[in-house]
């Protein structure tokens, strides 16, 4: 059996995440730091969503109480096409509303501001601006929001590891058959997600 690759730690701690949320908005419309802050927090608020999915979400993914989408990275490896729902917590609605696409061509406006091919670079530069303002003991990136979501879920919110696995919408070969028999309890996942999102105070970001 091939060895499982070791992934270097990418999570930041709760205090650093809160400091990012508390970063005051810069007055410039095209502020890299504002964008990076909001992208990190959007990812955390939406269960560690990756930027490819965030960019491509269709408007009809928005179901008022939750966002429903198929995770691009694993949709072709699973019978359910990696279908997932992430609950929209009330405290983060102002942040989501800030980026909704008024044309409704997609859920968020990123496709109108950045060509698809440039978006990864824009995300990287934006998060670097955040990192400069809020340093941590090791380098972090956009994907640190996903790692932080999982780490805080398990270590701080005391959510069991399998529920964290479900919240991340991971594909597990060992559980593939079993998962076909189990109907998802979305309310259980929503409740767990709420506990994670509630770990930080969103008032500063939602006022900004």
Task: Give a label for each model feature.
Residues 41, 45, 49-52, 122, ...:
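C-terminal catalytic core of tyrosine-transesterase DNA break-rejoin enzymes
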Residues 60-68, 137-138, 159-180, 202-208:
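Short, polar N-cap/turn motifs at the start of nucleic acid-interacting alpha helices
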Residues 11, 17, 89-137:
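Active-site/catalytic core of tyrosine-dependent DNA strand-transfer enzymes
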Residues 90, 104, 111-114, 174-176, ...:
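C-terminal secondary-structure termini that scaffold catalytic or DNA-interacting sites
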Residues 1-35:
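Long, amphipathic, Lys/Arg-enriched alpha-helical "connector/arm" segment
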Residues 56-98:
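Conserved tyrosine-mediated DNA breakage-rejoining catalytic core shared by Y-recombinases
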């Amino acid at each position: 059996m091939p060895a499982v690759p070791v992934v270097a730690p990418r999570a930041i701690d709760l205090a650093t995440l809160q400091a990012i949320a508390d970063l005051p908005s810069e007055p410039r419309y095209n502020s890299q730091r504002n964008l990076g802050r909001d992208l990190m927090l959007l990812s955390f608020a939406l269960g560690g969503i990756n930027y490819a999915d965030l960019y491509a979400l269709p408007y009809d993914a928005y179901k008022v109480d939750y966002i429903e989408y198929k995770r691009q990275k694993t949709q072709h490896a699973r019978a359910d096409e990696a279908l997932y729902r992430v609950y929209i917590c009330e405290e983060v609605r102002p942040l989501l509303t800030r980026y909704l696409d008024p044309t409704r061509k997609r859920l968020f406006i990123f496709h109108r501001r950045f060509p698809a091919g440039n978006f990864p670079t824009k995300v990287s530069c934006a998060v670097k601006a955040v990192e400069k303002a809020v340093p941590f003991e090791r380098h972090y990136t956009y994907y640190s929001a996903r790692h932080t979501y999982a780490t805080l879920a398990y270590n701080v919110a005391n959510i069991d590891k399998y529920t964290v696995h479900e919240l991340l919408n991971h594909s597990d070969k060992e559980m593939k058959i079993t998962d076909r028999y189990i109907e998802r309890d979305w309310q259980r996942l929503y409740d767990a997600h709420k506990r994670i999102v509630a770990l930080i105070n969103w008032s500063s970001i939602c006022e900004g």
